[in-house]
């Protein structure tokens, strides 16, 4: 997503992304608007926690606006990432992998209840300040300046200032990667949390792999925690 050359060509090209407020994150939307996909089979896999609110239909509409013919959109239900557990339907993933391999044309169905949920969400958001989500994070005195938060942030919205993490509003996607990866749980929310101690790291992806995949300009190399390996 950080490449200057955004022309991609392959037999199959897919986007796997979470949904925030029933839609793909802003940076994913911007990527789709700028990129060119030269493929006969473009697909999207969207992950969600509480409810999807018609995410497949919204993603299909986004692709149409971007001039991207999308052949397949499916949803993967995960437990909300506020909780320190991981729940993914392995059987559903197997079906998705088979569908994509066979180039199945299918868009996940959307109900009127899904659409109503999204409209209710939008109505609630209109009551909040436009930049409310940009001020969701704070850094406590527990910060040890390891730099992990800076390296896992996909939008360069957190940085080290005098060996202490500092959140930078403006481009924050509120993915909470910084909060979940902090070894001291020093990245907290500015609003009450159901469980302030609940943090989750995918056991199938090492922190080093996450950092290397992210590769933010200006970030240092993979950090070392007290335990040594990240």
Task: Identify what each model region corresponds to.
Residues 171, 175-191, 205-222:
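Short Fe-S-cluster ligation motifs
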């Amino acid at each position: 997503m950080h490449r200057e050359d955004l022309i991609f060509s392959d037999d199959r090209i897919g986007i796997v992304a979470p949904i925030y407020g029933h839609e793909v994150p802003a940076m994913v939307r911007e990527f789709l608007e700028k990129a060119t996909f030269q493929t006969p089979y473009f697909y999207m896999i969207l992950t969600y926690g509480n409810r999807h609110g018609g995410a497949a239909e919204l993603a299909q509409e986004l692709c149409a606006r971007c001039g991207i013919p999308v052949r397949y959109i499916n949803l993967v239900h995960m437990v909300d990432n506020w909780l320190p557990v991981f729940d993914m339907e392995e059987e559903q993933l197997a079906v998705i992998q088979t569908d994509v391999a066979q180039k199945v044309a299918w868009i996940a169905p959307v109900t009127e209840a899904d659409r109503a949920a999204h409209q209710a969400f939008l109505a609630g958001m209109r009551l909040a300040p436009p930049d409310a989500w940009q001020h969701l994070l704070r850094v406590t005195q527990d910060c040890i300046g390891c730099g992990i938060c800076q390296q896992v942030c996909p939008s360069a919205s957190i940085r080290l200032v005098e060996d202490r993490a500092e959140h930078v509003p403006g481009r924050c996607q509120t993915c909470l990667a910084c909060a979940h990866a902090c070894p001291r749980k020093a990245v907290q929310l500015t609003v009450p949390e159901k469980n302030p101690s609940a943090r989750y790291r995918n056991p199938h992806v090492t922190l080093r792999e996450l950092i290397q995949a992210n590769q933010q300009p200006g970030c240092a190399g993979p950090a070392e925690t007290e335990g040594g390996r990240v």
